[in-house]
Amino acid sequence: MTGVPMPVAVVISGRGSNMEAIARASLAAGSPYKVVRVVADRETAGGIARAAALGIPTSVVPVRQFPDRASFDAALAAELEGSGAKLVALAGFMRILSPEFVHRFEGRLLNIHPSLLPLYKGLDTHARALAAGDSHHGASVHYVTAELDGGPVIMQGRLRIRSGDTPDAVSARVHTLEHIIYPHVCTLIASGRVEWRTGSVFFDGAPLSAPLIEESDAAA
């Protein structure tokens, strides 16, 4: 990496807790990345105030003002490119992006999903993991591709499911892990340790055959 931090944009729909974790990590001395813009798809997103409190420029691309997905995606893409971001992190962004948008940002678009992908793509992941009797659950940071929740996984945070766990209890512990692994992945990419090469993930110059794993005693 060069001495200049990699500019990162974060896209949100809600309260922005993962965005705040990413942003706070970027404020640490020697961070290889800097959050240069937070973009929301609704004016009521709580994360806008969180970002502003950290001194991060914010903008809103209100999805309801656009007649279709294509026009919204085009406006969002223009906002992100105008920010100068080299990496875009979707953090609680509740829209499915078009294949055209994904292709435009190929190799520099991340998402976090609350399951150990490829398990439980889509919604209600915590309840589904409990119903299946799984021993472990967690979250995955992955590159975004046209396949929903199907891009190459970079890192997973994993925890053990406890006897008597509820979806809400598991969700709280998964969020703790999310706030660890998402900034970590941004750091790995910005420092050049993780790379996207023609649809594959490389770690320290070698193909990543399995996701990097983070297990936290506090979340176990």
Each predicted region: which residue ranges?
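Membrane-interface segments of envelope glycosyltransferases acting on lipid-linked substrates or membrane lipids
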Residues: M6-V10, V36, R128, V144, ...
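Donor/substrate-binding cores of folate-linked one-carbon enzymes
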Residues: A25, Y33, D41, L87, ...
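Short, structured coil segments at secondary-structure junctions
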Residues: L54-G55, F105
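Short beta->alpha connector loops at strand-helix junctions that form conserved
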Residues: S59-R64, I112
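Glycine-rich, highly charged phosphate/nucleotide-binding loops
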Residues: R64-L76
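Glycine-rich phosphate-binding loop signature in dinucleotide/nucleotide-binding domains
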Residues: E79-A85
